[in-house]
Amino acid sequence: LKVYLKKIALFIALLIALSATRAVSAQTQTGIKLTAQAGLDGACKVDAWLPVRVTVENTGADLEARVQASYKNDQGGASIYGVDVSLPASSRKEFFLYVYSTGATRNFSVSVLEGGTERANNKLNVSCADSDATLFGVVADDPSAYNILNDIRPLVGVTRLAHLTIADLPDSEQGWAALDALVVANVDTGKLSAAQKQALNLWIANGGKLFITGGLRWQTTTAGLKDFMPVNVTATKNVMGLSALAAYIKDASALDAGTIIAAGTLQKGASVLVEQDGVPLLVEMQRGYGKIYYFAADPALKPLSDWNGMKEIYDRLLAFKSPKPIWANASFDSNQANTALSSMPQLALPSIIYVCCWLGIYILVVGPVNYFVLRRMKRAELAWVTVPVLVIMFSCLAFISGYAYRGTTPILNRLALAQAWEGVDQARVNALVGVYSPSRTSYNVETQNQFMLYPLQDNQSLQGNNWLSLKNQNGTSLQDVRVEIGGVQSIGAEGYIPALGVRHNLVVSFGDVEILLEGTITNTSKYTLRDAILVTPNEWLPLGDLAPNATKQIAQLRLNAPNPQPIDVSGIMSTLGLRAYPAPTDSVEERRRAAFLQAALPSNNNSLALSGVYLMGWLDEIPAPIGLQDQSIKPIDTTLYFEKLAPSVSMQAKKIVLTSSLYHWESSLAGNALSSYSIPQGGYVVRYQPSIPVHLSAVDSLEFTLQTSAAPNKIEVSLWNFESKTWDIISLSFNLTSVPNAPKYVGTNGEIRFKISGSSNDYIDVQGINFTLRAQP
């Protein structure tokens, strides 16, 4: 019996082997070879675009094919992102597909289809990290020299290091969304394509950090990065040590070994962080929300390769995520967004006057008019005929008038939030699109200018819960969006449009006590920015409509208020003449704008904590490039426009006063919150860095106030000692606490770190930290 069972098992195994061989042979006989790589070295984040690098080789006959990536979505259908390609005989094509990653994206496949026949298939597995994770990318000849980045511990989330090549870098900015910082060292960047450079530039503007190294091979490293360099490098120079770098992080290491650095002249807008023997060693340049760093030495060579201080350099420069205002996080409040998308005349109830008049005429005709006509005709017995006829007639009229009220043309309610940055010619757009249909049908939604479409969380517009998005030369096309009679289906979109064009001469003047913002702002575009507002950390200034070529004067706004208060959203809405809870007299446009503003600025306690200077307003003339394929539409366009301004800095005083309103922060609390009503076990950390480039030569004093109703003995506050690299407990006062030996607790870049601790069993409402730093630039 055992021998018999063994023979059966052997026979089954042979059949399986033969079938597997046949499958491989069938795939080979198609002449199609498909390879695919998901993410950045396999790394990705949820609710962000996932780049899939695809290579297709055709060794057979000419082929018209569709290459697509697909996965099973939360609704039980298939989400498919594809592109139609021509594959001539003996051809090879390489390109990126972009898949919107959700919590359901775990296993997906990349396939090549000819008609409905699958010619090749690759199965891929991904495990996308949460959005608060930190992803470092390294493009280097020796990636292992930067493995120390794995040891950096951000305040929240995990750290992941991706080893990349030039070819791995996506050609669209959306594909860079998961990446927080990129290190480029000793590789030929001249291989970067124009599309990759544009994507890199937009990624930096949207908050990415680029770290470029120098050293002996600086020419290779900078070959394709001329437009990104804070320094115009011209030659190398020998230095007899890097003591200034150790002093920058208050490290006791000598770093007295000689090394070679790549020297040059500063570009406009660049500032020196570290200078060695008169040569800029570490330089930074702000671009939008992000930063570019140039490090003139080579960290992969001695003495830096043996120096532990490089970890702190990376931690200080790269671990602190680029701060962005809440509207730039591409996240909308879903309730307010739905309200804004449904705010159109066709979905509003008919006027009460219209309804009353209609009912009045109906009652009058069916009753008195019908009676007097039949009486005059002396044919009262016909009432049993005329009444039903009149009822049917009025019912038909009601149906026709209702159909006319809904209209006969589909409507696209396009809500766009545009974010521009000074010095960048493109503005990022996050859009919500509501597709309204007067009848039950399906549409193909298409975009221009390389806009990408993605499903919203509560999207029910998919035909059979399937999502089919096809990439083309101009943008994307979303197939079979089903809309019910008088219904609205919502879709998300991302892309870029030309920036508005704003010129200014704003100056931040540092005085002994006050830091003032003043100057002029000019609209150099052909569009009117309506209800413009200048937003600063402490207040907002209504500017009214900013017409083409119009100029507004800004007169001495104080930026360093001693007790800064968050920007009040309801106050901005009131300034714009909008209401959080619309009144019956509000127009449909006012309701739509109010809801969209609240969707774009979701906030806790009705307030926004901001740093930086922004110009905001409404645009009527620039729509998001989204329409319906082969279908005329009636568009409703609402664009909320923001531009981050970069005022110049005038350091007039020998001593300056910096307050918390001039700082970005990063918190270990969930959601990067600054306040807490329940201190977690072990406490939490808040890390502050200046939002305006400032470098301190000396610190005179540091004072802070903890906004809390709890007694000082209930809370423990510690400050990070940059010299001993430890947390030091600070004795709290009831009101203002003066910090002893303040220079130890302030980094050379003005950074300050607080740690708040207390019993997790007590109710301790820490609402914020206000501090005042007196220093010498």
List the model feature ranges, each with a label.
Residues 9-19:
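Bacterial N-terminal signal peptides
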Residues 1-10:
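Bacterial N-terminal signal peptides that target proteins for export
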Residues 176-223, 286-295:
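Short alpha-beta junction capping motif
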Residues 48, 105-188, 216, 220, ...:
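Aromatic-Pro/Gly-enriched surface loop or interdomain linker
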Residues 27-75, 81-98, 102-104, 108, ...:
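Extracellular ligand-binding/catalytic regions of CAZymes and related secreted enzymes
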Residues 433-587:
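Soluble catalytic regions of membrane-associated enzymes that act on cell-envelope
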Residues 22-26:
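Sec/Tat signal peptide C-region and signal peptidase I cleavage site
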Residues 209-284, 290-295:
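An acidic, glycine-rich "communication" segment
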